Amino acid sequence: MAVVFLLGPGMWDKARRPTADPAPMQIRRNIARGLQSRGHEVILMEDDPDRPEEDYIQKFDRLLRCKVTDVVLYWPPLAKMQTTYDELILLCDRRALLEKASIRLWALHHSTVATITREEFKVLESGNRSRYLTAVARLGLRPLEWEDEEDLAEQVRLLSTEL
């Protein structure tokens, strides 16, 4: 079974979407439960206790090196994504580790936020970060696109069989 490092936003971007339930963090927890129910271990940074004198990047590295087999990015529309962008860039800087450990990358993204191919990661939302994220696509990012909650649940189910 897989060890999944599940990345993604924790909250909505209040400037673009009024606060609504469930928050992206809750949806990530639901995704985690779905994967766990199929026998996979899931790591969420928010749930792992901070360690004394460990900064955010050190925590990210420690968790990534924790027998992770797959990194899954959850990306809904209108979410606050800055920290998630940073995490994706951190993955690019860890290319050697990803290759050595054969860690696969997945993007569970809404159809309105990005188009992803092997050679391009094009952000469709405002605040375009495409030129930086194309390097992530070139790491072998596997896109899993969804349109609505039912479609998201189906993509999670299909993902759980691929892990």
Feature-to-residue mapping (PLM):
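Conserved catalytic or regulatory cores that recognize and/or transform ribose-phosphate-containing ligands
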Residues: 1-163
